[in-house]
Amino acid sequence: MRNTLDNLLNAAGIVISDKQKNLLIQYVDMLNKWNKAYNLTSVRDPQQMLVRHIMDSIVVEPHLHGQRFIDVGTGPGLPGIPLAIVRPDSHFTLLDSLGKRVRFLRQVQHELQLENITPVQSRVEEFPAEPPFDGVISRAFASLHDMISWCNHLPARPAGRFYALKGVLPEDELSSLPQGVSLDQVIRLSVPDLEGERHLVVLKPN
């Protein structure tokens, strides 16, 4: 698995330490092991997890600004845990409403000794942002409209941002953004060995 990860990182032009590579592989091992009992992801093959979960998460890292982030609807920790591994100087709150997912996140935190994550079981609209976050991240969580509606209290103003990971660019969602936000930028992402388009939509709270 290490060779596969090395090849993917090289193809993406991402440089991380051996320790970070080992942590990413440990995380995939744990996800694969827990997935058999808890059904945390539809991806069953660890090699595919490297592409569709690890690489698909960490290609976002250069585009994040700030130090405090919240990953809403994180599921088994995506993209929050891979981002926390490759960005150790930032802190990531990992929010999910399902207990089994949060139990997994806490086990990952313990086994990988990740001091820069905080797993939280809560519905996003009930979670207090005190203080507000530099970035609100979502991946496969909701439409842009719902994300803004549920998470509007979370980002700092005016500097905070919403970061939504999307596949094909959702033109219809972008044309019907709710009041209170505006489009900051759209970044086309390149994920080695992943078919289909990937985009990062960055929204700015007004």
From Swiss-Prot:
State the top-level EC class: transferase
Q: Does the keyword Mitochondrion apply?
A: no
By its UniProt entry, which Pfam families does this protein fall under?
GidB
Q: Which UniProt keywords apply?
A: Cytoplasm, Methyltransferase, rRNA processing, S-adenosyl-L-methionine, Transferase
- Which family does the record claim for this protein? Belongs to the methyltransferase superfamily. RNA methyltransferase RsmG family.
HAMAP family xref list: 16SrRNA_methyltr_G
Protein name as catalogued: Ribosomal RNA small subunit methyltransferase G
Q: Which organism is it from?
A: Pectobacterium carotovorum subsp. carotovorum (strain PC1)
Name of the coding gene: rsmG
